[in-house]
């Protein structure tokens, strides 16, 4: 999904998937296990990195059942949520170009959302 939070001193842009239900989370993890290179390309792309530094969200301490700790994308598989997040200053929120920043961030996030929802 897409999320815009506006609050003095605490505004941010986010989205992705926040604590998805177990069947969805399992489907996302299976997708990462099968095609984690694509997810890595998305979160390392220039467009994505223009707005977001990576993915935020809680992780399991150990791999979920059925996944090897040696899997090349195990750190992504251990995630419970998949959240891009960009903090915003109050001056950014009131800037005339703010709408363009939000639209740009949401466009940069779309490939991530597409990846997360494929197969759900």
Regions found by a protein language model. Name each.
Residues 1, 23, 41-59:
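Soluble extramembrane domains of integral membrane proteins
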Residues 1-33:
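Aromatic- and glycine-enriched beta-alpha-beta binding-site module
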Residues 32-33, 45, 53-120:
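Long, solvent-exposed, polar/charged low-complexity segments
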């Amino acid at each position: 999904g897409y999320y815009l939070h506006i609050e003095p001193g605490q505004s941010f842009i986010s989205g992705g998937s926040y604590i998805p239900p177990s069947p969805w989370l399992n489907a996302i993890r299976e997708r990462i296990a099968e095609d984690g290179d694509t997810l890595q390309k998305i979160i390392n792309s220039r467009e994505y990195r223009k707005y977001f530094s990576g993915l935020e969200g809680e992780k399991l301490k150990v791999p979920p059942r059925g996944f090897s700790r040696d899997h090349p994308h195990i750190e992504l598989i251990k995630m419970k949520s998949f959240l891009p997040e960009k903090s915003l200053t109050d001056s950014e929120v009131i800037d005339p170009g703010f709408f363009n920043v939000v639209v740009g961030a949401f466009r940069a996030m779309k490939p991530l959302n597409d990846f997360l929802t494929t197969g759900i």
